[in-house]
Amino acid sequence: MSFSLSSSFSFSTKTTHLSDSIRFSLPSHLKVRTNIWTRRPLGSSSISPLRRRSCKCCSSMSAAEPVSSPQDYILYSRAYWVSRTVIAWNVNVGDGSCFLYASKYASLLNSDDEIQGYHHKIKLHEDTAGLSANVKEKFPHIRDYRAFKVPSDLDVKNLVKCQLVIAAYQPNGQLKDATGLQIAGVLDDLFSYHGPLGAVFSKEFVTLYLWAPTAQVVRACLYQDPSSSSPIEVIKLDELNGVWTATGPKSWEGCYYVYEVSVYHASTSQIEKVIANDPYARGLSADGQRTFLVDLSSDALKPEGWDNLPDEKPPLHSFSDISIYELHVRDFSANDPTVPSEFCGGYLAFTSQDSAGIRHLKRLSSAGITHLHLLPTFQFAGVADERDKWKNADNQLLESLPPDSDGQQAHITAIQNDDGYNWGYNPVLWGVPKGSYASDPNGSCRTLEFRKMVQALNRLGFRVVLDVVYNHLHASGPSDEKSVLDKIVPGYYVRRNTDGHIENSTCTNNTASENFMVERLIIDDLLCWAVDYKVDGFRFDLMGHIMKRTMVNAKNVLSSLSKDANGVEGSDIYLYGEGWDFGEVAKNARGTNASQFNVHGTGIGSFNDRIRDALLGGSPFGHPLQQGFVTGLLLQPNGYDHGGKEVEKKMLAVAKDHIQVGMAANLKDFVLTNCGGQEVKGSEVYSYDGISVAYASNPTETVNYISAHDNETLFDIISLKTPAGISVDERCRLNHLATSIIAFSQGIPFFHAGDEILRSKSLDRDSYNSGDWFNRIDFSYNSNNWGIGLPPKEKNESNWPLIRPRLADVSFKPQRSHILLALENFIDVLQIRYSSPLLRLRTANAIQQRLRFHNTGPSSNPGIVVMSIEDGHEGLPGLSQLDPIYSYILVIINVQPTDSSFTIPTLRPRNLQLHPIQMNSTDEVIKNSTYDVSTGHFCIPPLSTAVFVEQRTSE
C-alpha cells in the first residue's frame, strides 16, 4: 500500500552549514499532520483504522475494555516469559512475594484476594541485575521491566501448555497485582525448530509435521474429498519437543485434512478445541475449508517444459535494469471479451495467445518492462473461491446512469462483499494460490494453473513478482474459520501490546516476525513460491512492520538458491517493499525494522514516496487540491490557498529539489545544489517535519513511483488537482510527463497498470472492494473508465462535492485518440530508458560521477528540471565508457504551460540532438524541442520531457 513516511512532501531544505541554512515555514493549514493509517491527528490513541483493507473484512481477538482491578487479571497479559529462566514484569514486588500459577484445565480464579484453581504454584525471586542484554535486544519495548528468576528444575515445556498467571502480593499477603503472560520468548528459547513442517512426501509414506508447543492434544481429521461430512480417519499425532507428527501411507496423497487442536487460548481464558488448516498448507479445498495433501514435486502438476523454465526466463543482467508494472489478476481480463469466458479474471487469462490484454503486455515487454507485479495471489478472504457463489453487477443498468450519479456506487457496494472482487490484502494462508482465480478451487487445479501463468508471463518476456502480505493476518482467535496461525499457537504469531492485546496498526492482527518461528514461516513461504512456482521477485506489503533481520535473512536464503541445486537462480530474485515507519514498530521500538532508513545498504528496495508527493502535491491524506510539481503548483493554480504566490514559489522550488534527489535514485550521499544555492547531500535535504528525503545507499534500493493500486490513479489525481478550466489535452500531457520523470530517474521505475492508457477509476481513491465496475481496464483503448459514477461513498463521500462536477463535465473524458497517444508516448519513454545504460546506472559512485543537475540555485526556474548524464571514452582517462552509442544524455522537464527557452553555456561544445525515438515520435509536440549548438540555447514545448543525446562519432 502506497502511503507516506511523512504526511506531506517536504517543504523545507536543511544543510549542515547552519549559518546558510534555508528554513521554510508552511501556512498553518498545510501543516496539519495526521497518522497515516487512522487519519487522525498524530498523538491520537485510537487504533480504529480507515484503510483500504477495511477491518470490516478482518477479525481480531484483541479488543478489551480497560480495567484496573486484580479481579480482572485474566483480561491482560502484561508479563513476558522471555526465556527459559526469566519472566519480565513491570511490577515492584518490594518486600512482598511473587508467584507463578499454572492450570492445565484453565481453572484459575481470584477468590478472596488469592489465586485458586491451580495445579502448580511456583515462587519467583527478582533478579536485581535486571534483564540481560540479549533480552533487552529482543524485547526493547520492555527493557526497563524487572526480571524474575524461574527455578531451574521447573518443567517449563509442559508448563507453557497451561493457563498461566503471575501474581504479586503485599508483605501482608494481600494480592497486589496479577496478570497473564506472553510466552513467545520462552517458546523461542525452548522450541525453535529447523526440521520439516507441513506434509512431507516420500515414495511410500506421507508424514505430517505441526509446530504447536502449547497444544495439549493434536489430531488430524482425514477426508476423502473436499465436501464429505465425515472423516475417513482421525489420527492422533505424537509430540516431540513441540512438534507433532503422524505418518501414513502414500494413499493419503490427494486427500484433505484439518487439524483438531486442544490448546489454551488467552483471548477466551479457556482450553479450546479448534479446527484449523495446516499453516504450511500447499493446497486447499474451496474457501480454505480443508488442507489438500498435494506433492508439489509431482510431474502431474508441471506444465510441459516446467523444469526448463529457468532457461526460458528473460535475461536480467542487473537489478538496475528492472522496471515494474503492477497489475491485479482480475483487472487484467475480467472485462476483456477477447479472452475465453472460462479464463476471464483468472490465472489462465495470461495463457491466452492473442487477447487484447496479451497484445498490450507484449508491447510493454518489447518496450522494456521487465517485471510484472501481481497483487496478492495467495489464499485471501473477501472473495468466495467458487464463482457460482458470486453476486454480479447489472452492467446494463450501471451504463444507463449519468456519469456523476451516486447510483453506480450504491449498486456496487450492495454486493461488494459477495462479488468476485477484492485486492486480496486479507491473508488467510500465505503459501497456497488463491482459489477464486482458478478454474476449480478444489484439488490441484490452482497449482497447475498458477504455474501455467508464471510460465506464460516468462515467455512473454516478464519476470513475475508476487505481492506478499506477511505483516498481518485476516483473522485471529479460536472461533473464526479464517483464523489459522492464532488457533495453532495462540498469541505467538501475532504482535501484542503491553496489555497482551493484538496490535492493529497495519489494519488488524499484526504479525510478529521478531519471533523465530514467524520469521521461519515467512522465509519458508518465500522459498516455496521461489522454488516451487519459480517466482522472480517479491513486493512486501508494509515491509516496515517486518524486522530488518527477517528481510535480510530472507534475501540471503533466496540469493543462495541455484539453478543446479534448486531449479532457480536465486541471485536474480529482487525484493522490495513499503518501508513506512509507523505504529508500534516505529523508531525500532520492537527491534530494528525494515523501514526505508534501516534497509539501506542491504540491496532491498523500498518505495520512494518523496518523489511521488513532490510531483503530485500534498500527500494521499492531505487536501485533494494541494498541488505539486506536475499538477500546477504556482504555474497553473487551481484556487486552493497554498499561502500566496511567494509561498507557492518556494514550495515549487523545494519540490524540485526532492524530485532531483529522487531522479538521482534517492541516494543519501549524492551531492547537488539545492534551491538555496548550497551544495548538500541527498540526506541533507529535509521534509518540513525534519525527515531526510534521501535514504538509499545504492540505486536498486529506490523504487520510484507516482501511482500504485492505492489512492487515485495518476490520471484521476491529475484531473482532481489541476484547474478545472484546462483542457483534457493538457491533462493527458501531464499524465505522460509524470510517467516520463519516473522512467528517466535512476533507480527502479514502478508503474501502475493503466498509467500508460490514462486509466481512471472515476476518482475512487481506494478501490480495494469497488468491484470490476470501478477497477475496469479497457485494452481495446475505447474508454479509460472516466465518468462511470461517483466513487463508493465509504472512502470518497467527503470529496464528492469536488468530484461530481468533474465527472459531469464531458470535456474531462479522454477520447480514444488521447488513449492511443498516451500509450505511444509511454512506449517511447520506455524505449529511451533502455536505449542507454546511462539511464540505468548500477552504482552510487557512477551516479555521483556522471549525473548532474543544471538550472539550480535561487535564481533558477523552478518549473524546469535539467539533468545530464556523461559517459567516458574508450582508451581515454577519466570515466569509463558504458554506452557505445551515446556519450552524453540530457533530460529536460518543462512543467510550465508555455514554451521554455533558456541557455546553458557549459553545454555549447556538445553536439546534442533530440533523441531519435522522440524525433520519430507520434507526439508532434515533442518534436518542437530545439537546441542551438552554437549558443547552448534550448527551447522546450510546454508540459513536456525532452531527451537530447550526443552520439559518438566513429574514429
Map each language-model feature to its residues.
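N-terminal chloroplast transit peptides
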Residues: 1-39
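The feature marks proteins involved in alpha-glucan
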Residues: 39-83, 98, 103-207, 229, ...
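Short proline/glycine-enriched turn/loop motifs at strand-loop junctions of beta-rich domains
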Residues: 90-97, 211-218, 252, 896-898, ...
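Conserved, mostly hydrophobic/aromatic
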Residues: 210, 259, 327, 374, ...
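C-terminal beta-strand-rich structural cap/linker in extracellular carbohydrate-active enzymes
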Residues: 253-257, 929-955
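Substrate-binding/active-site clefts of carbohydrate-active enzymes
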Residues: 330-335, 339-351, 362-370, 375-533, ...
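Active-site-proximal helices and loops of the catalytic beta/alpha 8
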Residues: 387, 391, 542-689, 693-695, ...
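Loop/helix patches that line or flank the sugar-binding groove of alpha-linked glycan CAZymes
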Residues: 686-890, 895-912
